[in-house]
Amino acid sequence: MFEAVEGMLAEHADLEQRLGAPETHADARLAKQLNQRYAALSSIIGAYRELQQLDDDIEAARELAQEDPAFAEEAAALTGRRQEVEERLRRLLVPRDAADDKDAILEVKSGEGGEESALFAGDLLRMYTRYAEARGWKVEVLDAAESDLGGYKSVTVAVKAKGTPEPGEAPYALLKFEGGVHRVQRVPVTESQGRVHTSAAGVLVLPEAEQVDVQIDENDLRIDVFRSSGPGGQSVNTTDSAVRITHLPTGIVVSCQNEKSQLQNREQAMRILRSRLLAAAQEKADAEAGEARRSQVRTVDRSERIRTYNFPENRISDHRTGYKAYNLDQVLDGDLQPVLDSCVEADLAARLEALEQ
């Protein structure tokens, strides 16, 4: 497995040279791609060189231990350290999703449960926003349809990192595990009898595509315009500023009404459309290669849940990993990392197992 690192050394040196050239930075997108690859290789090569150094130190300690038994303890400590570094290197070498270095488009939609579901969708958006802010990410609302009580029938946001994140630390690499149906159990604000109700909201996470990632023929698009609407369906704009784009070959439909101008809404809708097309192309490629991942839920249904948020018990349960904690209030306030870590670990374990078969 570690033989592959030898080939990475030359690539790493070449990238270092290219990144030092002024002409590379004239193309911002190319510079970003090279920086991401360089960061990934730097982590791998750093661990590999540390492993080599530990091998030398262990050998030296064992030789010295033949004359002075005190060095036997040092050799044992170094051996333990070597096992840790070897495991870290194995993890770094596990193939990741091609889109793991990208920013994310995140959609939250209310499902069964009416107004209560819409309010819960708002709670989820707040959770993701707080989590993103804690990581220094930027959250931009692309489209939103509010409910009568201030929740969301649907809301779409872009989550963008600052600079070049470490491998596995980009928005999509972490937030992709949020895709699916989230179930909530609590007493709704509309419930007068104090009974606990169950409702659900659906989350879809896409890697944000850049224009060069997906080529879209304008002839394949049908673009409709209409007036933006607010809670209850009332019109909030006197002009046709909202935009609906249909990609005819795939049937994918995207609409945006959050911005004041038709041009801005069209640009935002195209961002979402590119990301959906990129995700669809990746899923098709995975399926053709026989490596299809569990697809994220696109229809909001209570029965296909990935996580339950139980307010009476202050409990959060992830049904994929078995993670359970009684700090729901903190999680909804953005303390989402332990939940995501359980998903990352489960995903990594599955990839390692597949790699070793």
Swiss-Prot record:
Q: Which of UniProt's keywords are assigned here?
A: Cytoplasm, Methylation, Protein biosynthesis
Enumerate the subcellular locations listed in this protein's record, separating them with semicolons. Cytoplasm
Database matches in Pfam families: PCRF, RF-1
**Can you name one GO molecular function term for this protein?**
translation release factor activity, codon specific
The residues forming the signal peptide are: none
The keyword Transmembrane helix is assigned to this record = no
Q: Which residues carry this modification: N5-methylglutamine?
A: Q234
Which GO CC annotations does the UniProt entry carry? cytoplasm
What PTM annotation applies here? Methylated by PrmC. Methylation increases the termination efficiency of RF1.
Q: Which Gene3D superfamilies match?
A: 3.30.160.20, 3.30.70.1660, 6.10.140.1950
Q: Which NCBIfam families match?
A: prfA, PRK00591.1
According to its UniProt entry, what is the function of this protein?
Peptide chain release factor 1 directs the termination of translation in response to the peptide chain termination codons UAG and UAA.
> What family name appears in the similarity comment?
Belongs to the prokaryotic/mitochondrial release factor family.
Q: What is this protein called?
A: Peptide chain release factor 1
Lineage of this protein's species?
Answer: Bacteria, Bacillati, Actinomycetota, Actinomycetes, Propionibacteriales
